[in-house]
UniProtKB/Swiss-Prot annotation:
Quaternary state and interactors: Homodimer.
Annotated catalytic residues: 11 (tele-phosphohistidine intermediate), 89 (proton donor/acceptor)
InterPro entries: His_Pase_superF_clade-1, His_PPase_superfam, PG/BPGM_mutase_AS, Phosphogly_mut1
Biological processes, Gene Ontology terms: gluconeogenesis; glycolytic process
Pathway participation: Carbohydrate degradation; glycolysis; pyruvate from D-glyceraldehyde 3-phosphate: step 3/5
The keyword Cell wall biogenesis/degradation belongs to this UniProt entry's keyword annotation: no
Keyword check for Ion transport: no
Gene3D superfamilies, per database record: Phosphoglycerate mutase-like
Native source organism of the sequence: Bradyrhizobium sp. (strain BTAi1 / ATCC BAA-1182)
Function in brief: Catalyzes the interconversion of 2-phosphoglycerate and 3-phosphoglycerate.
Name listed for the protein in its UniProt record: 2,3-bisphosphoglycerate-dependent phosphoglycerate mutase
């Protein structure tokens, strides 16, 4: 029986991560460090003997570039890939493009903290984490998971908050639990699933 392999990786450091800006659906590329992180992710996966049958990513450059660099390291540059905005980062609305310190100065530290760290309170014109999960989860269940369960070795390169949606389901986390989960840039997480789609094993390639 073929293995049910699912690997999740957050994009490498972006130019706006470096500048401490709210990014969301804005589209900066990777920094030099981000490029290095993505290549290292590919090398780590190769060292574990992994190759893939299919990949998924968002409509944003930083995730697509990360995926390309990983696949180049794996010697799989032509891997079939689906891109979909369901995997885009959380939309930060009016916060997008603002320095996080400037946002605190404008709205107050407590309000910005609520927007960033609550489960269901969106910033003006943007999405809450709950909203982000509401678009990412159906895509995972309908488009990604069926292939994994058929034995397609699957790689997903996306964003901190859209990946939280997948992790919330995989690890059966509560809203409070997923809020506490931080995802490092460019670090693959390897899941192997049981036939009922629950997690058989998990390996985080941090470090």
């Amino acid at each position: 029986m073929s293995e049910r392999l699912l690997v999740l990786v957050r994009h490498g450091q972006s130019e706006w991560n470096l500048k401490n800006l709210f990014t969301g659906w804005k589209d900066p590329d990777l920094t030099e460090q981000g490029v290095s992180e993505a290549k290292e992710a590919g090398r780590k996966l190769k060292a574990h003997g992994l190759t893939f049958d299919v990949a998924f990513t968002s409509e944003l450059t930083r995730a697509q570039h990360t995926l390309k660099l990983i696949l180049d390291e794996l010697g799989q540059p032509g891997l079939p890939t689906s891109r979909n905005l369901a995997l885009n980062e959380r939309d930060y609305g009016d916060l997008s493009g603002l320095n996080k310190d400037d946002a605190r100065a404008k709205w107050g530290e407590e309000q910005v903290h609520v927007w960033r760290r609550s489960y269901d309170v969106p910033p003006p014109g943007g999405e809450s984490l709950k909203d982000t999960l509401a678009r990412a989860l159906p895509y995972y269940v309908q488009e990604i998971l069926p292939g994994v369960l058929r034995g397609q070795r699957t790689l997903v390169a996306a964003h901190g908050n859209s990946l939280r949606a997948l992790i919330m389901v995989l690890e059966k986390l509560t809203p409070e639990g997923i809020l506490k989960r931080e995802l490092a840039t460019g670090v693959p997480i390897i899941y192997r699933l049981k036939a009922d789609s629950t997690v058989e094993s998990k390996l985080d390639l941090a470090g």
